[in-house]
């Protein structure tokens, strides 16, 4: 096993890095260096967690997974926004239930400001909020939502008495408690951002249902969303590609900061602006609105160039080929012939989600 690295040093380096070919195809040397550096540091971070927690016990924050370590990385809270579960675990050798109790309370009462929490360190920077992010998404044992510390404490004590589990990782005993979110947790999170979505929809002329479908597919409405490619926030915008393109189109220099993209309103605005760019600029040669929507969705994931190259290396000829096809044929080709399996699945997922939002 590799020696433990100084995580206090790694954490700020992680925060300064960014990368991805996703959602845009801008390329420069600095961006490549950032990509390589981020990948290396994430690998080191994962190795450190494995050294402490054991093989197959590595958990790192992702687009649909909030993971926060505390207590010198001995305690962690994991919210799986896809499955709708919260799992709080500890490998603390002394008073494990006390560590779990504190982490449960903090998780239930945390706010929704990703800029205040460092997901790559063990700093206990989770602030108790008067408007908890999980309010209404979790009900206590009496069926009540949890807003105040007293109710959260009582519920934590109940959980430790009735749902405490343990398992061995071969090195240590892992103590855990799992909490289920309410069945409609996805809708409750989506509702928080409806006003921002409507504003961005009117500003850029992008259908609300498409914005919501992208958000659901990208992050499951997790404002803390990060990815291995360093895509950030609700719509998983990458600073050096889509973010830079949008800033340039708005007459701004540079790239959006991490804090900017972790702000829900700014993230939704930037992601929606990029959808509009794909529709009105990069893929504007596609005449049928349904065919163009399929292309835009796929391009949001894998880039406009990769979409057009499926049909022809010449952009104009590619658009002409698409224009001679029915929307159904375009959909079939994008979901079967795109070189990226992720992009092929992405169109299916977003299109299905958009249909469900249109019916509401």
UniProtKB/Swiss-Prot annotation:
Disulfide bond annotation, renumbered to this chain: none
Q: What does this protein do?
A: Murein-degrading enzyme. May play a role in recycling of muropeptides during cell elongation and/or cell division.
Q: Where in the cell is it found?
A: Cell outer membrane
E.C. number:
4.2.2.n1
UniProt cross-references to Pfam families, sorted A to Z: Mltc_N (PF11873), SLT (PF01464)
Membrane topology category: Lipid-anchor
State the reactions this protein catalyses.
Answer: Exolytic cleavage of the (1->4)-beta-glycosidic linkage between N-acetylmuramic acid (MurNAc) and N-acetylglucosamine (GlcNAc) residues in peptidoglycan, from either the reducing or the non-reducing ends of the peptidoglycan chains, with concomitant formation of a 1,6-anhydrobond in the MurNAc residue
Which named protein is this? Membrane-bound lytic murein transglycosylase C
Primary localization class, coarse? membrane
As for family, the record states: Belongs to the transglycosylase Slt family.
Signal peptide per UniProt: 1-16
